[in-house]
Amino acid sequence: MKALFLMGLLALVASAAFAQYGEVVGSYEGGAGGGGAQQCPLGTKLDSCRNYLLDRCTTMKDFPVTWRWWTWWKGGCEELLHDCCSQLSQMPPQCRCNIIQGSIQRDLGGFFGFQRDRTVKVIQAAKNLPPRCNQGPACNIPSTIGYYW
């Protein structure tokens, strides 16, 4: 019973830390313009980017009637990447990395999140998403997001 209580308490503390971190991710410092702290669009969902980064490439638009499923799978990934790049191009450049990080953070975080090696791969892909879309330099996403221990 003690172990269950401690797990619940740990989950509560972890979710509170995650919520506080999520509030910080939405802002950025204005650079040469001297405008100070500005707000990025909060609540922006990049579902296609999230699904692409998490290897959820099945689009289910055309269910394959073929035994060559790998062709269908690859096509789904490329379609998601195209949609993701299109969505990223509509974001302010200074907000892209924060929005990318926010889109995958809930899947990587928490007590029962991804395994460590899988998390590192997803974060690396997220860092390289803007250059892959020809939309600026790589993101500086810390490789420790999602872990509280």
Curated annotation (Swiss-Prot):
Five disulfide bonds are present. InterPro entries: Bifun_inhib/LTP/seed_sf (IPR036312), Bifunc_inhib/LTP/seed_store (IPR016140), Glia_glutenin (IPR001954). The keyword Ligase does not apply. Residues 1-19 form the signal peptide. Gene3D superfamilies: Plant lipid-transfer and hydrophobic proteins. Residues 20-28, 148-149 form a propeptide. Its main location: membrane. It is found in: Membrane; Secreted, Extracellular space. GO terms for cellular component: extracellular region; membrane. Found in endosperm and aleurone layer of developing kernels, but not in the embryo. GO terms for molecular function: nutrient reservoir activity; toxin activity. GO terms for biological process: defense response to bacterium. It comes from the Eukaryota. Keywords: Antibiotic, Antimicrobial, Disulfide bond, Membrane, Plant defense, Secreted, Signal, Toxin. Acts as a membranotoxin, probably through its antibacterial and antifungal activities, contributing to the defense mechanism of the plant against predators. Forms monovalent cation-selective ion channels in membranes. Contributes to grain texture and hardness. This is Hordoindoline-A. The gene is HINA.
